């Protein structure tokens, strides 16, 4: 009797969580209220329905990515407000004369940086530079910021340390005595990055929005200003701080300082030296982004804690029968991860799917490395929503984007890159190697 009640309670929490997931999807797509409001309604609702404890529903406020966002908003604002972003942007545009050339250059630089730096950290340090380029060239920010964050995600698949999901998969493999080489992800990741760049400088270019009319008029990045009265030393300090922040992120493991801590050291140096005033530093923190991300983390947590994510994945896999073909299984795992990652975040999706994928590989006798590679690459396809990965959320307000802008540009990218990935995966990582 108690067992039946327990199962009913679990089913009830999963049903409620599914309801909140569907509500979020509909409201995000409809966008009649700001996305951050929808996200926070979900967080509050999950608390009121006892799906999550309040401390878990709002744990996002102390999440390392949120703390990184806040510090990088300040560093980015100082870099922009001192005029240094515009100067650097002017140098870059000497080599990239057209929007398509600029997009190609941005995606190459971002992708390669993401392979050695975290994809979120790479996007965070390059966003103010691209805003400066936008101001120098009058190219719309919305045309170049989406390719930036998408390239950051693709570049994360160039190495073991490029994205958190890669390390999660590595940890899972190590429990069964297997592992990936440092650059082994690049067998799939590098071709995908190349395909993504070609996509956006050709047919994908027309899918990028021109959202100048939608940009936040109160944002410092939307206001024309003169930098003549700003002391030159402030610009140089902002550049030096940005460079040292990047270096600290690159050598995070060696120096033992977390990304967000390095970013906050840089932000505090800028405030203490009065390169940026404390009031301007506070104003630069985009609360739309913070609240959207915090709310989406609550939903991701609920999907994981209630087993709803497991339920979705296992239900789909079970439909394949007892002896699924390797190709069908690979495609299904890839699609599940690609769908979940756009609503749970890429890190949460990988964390959810890694143990499931290992169990599947052991059940059918497949190479766990192959199954996990499909899992990680599918989980990196977080291009179709502003909540799929932290960088997507960071540029949402700055670029004046709507939810459907991500769908319009990101969904075709997922399809194109997904097709190439599914061709390459069985070549480099066959489920049943000879």
What are these regions, as identified by a protein language model?
Residues 24-33, 109-118, 149-161, 248-254, ...:
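Transmembrane alpha-helix interface/packing and boundary motifs in multi-pass membrane proteins
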Residues 44, 48-140, 284-289, 293-364:
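Membrane-embedded alpha-helical segments and adjacent helix-loop junctions characteristic
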